[in-house]
Amino acid sequence: KHWKVRLSDPNPEVREKSRIGLAQAMREAKGVGGTSVLLVPGRVKGDQETHQHVWDRSIEQIRKLIPLASELKIHILIETVWNGFCYKPEQFRDYIDAINSPWVQAYYDIGNMQKYGPSHKWIRILGNRALKLDVKDWGSKNGFCPLGQGDVDWKKVRHELEQIEFRGWATREGNDGGV
């Protein structure tokens, strides 16, 4: 639903519906023993939904949910995806920082963002904002591919994860026939 019912939608009623859906997901996560929910905050879609619109509208809605996140002890984790939003690690870091809550962090997808810059650089810049990871590979010649067959420099990724003392969860994502 996060592609159709977005926190960044031009229609305030759709944004409210998205916020209510996220609150429900947070309660459900708590109910099953989860610690976080994944969120795609919006999608850049033209003049009515620009990068700045996604930034401003999604932050406004996310901030409304911070008290619930704190009460439930459920993190809202913003995932890095191909939605036209924050394709530079500095932008994504600044977006997380603009929300200004320990309950809102990053769900960094290693393969997704390799397309826009070396994954190890993203990890270094995001630092301890990266609470959880998706692990997959991506290559400029072969798209999503088995681990080790794309452009991700896994040795540098591991090094940067050690440097930021990453201790969160890493989920293997993909149906690429790898590992």
Stretch-by-stretch model annotation:
Residues 2-108, 113-115:
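Active-site acidic/histidine proton-transfer and metal-coordination neighborhood
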Residues 27, 35, 63, 89-179:
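Histidine-acidic metal/acid-base catalytic patches
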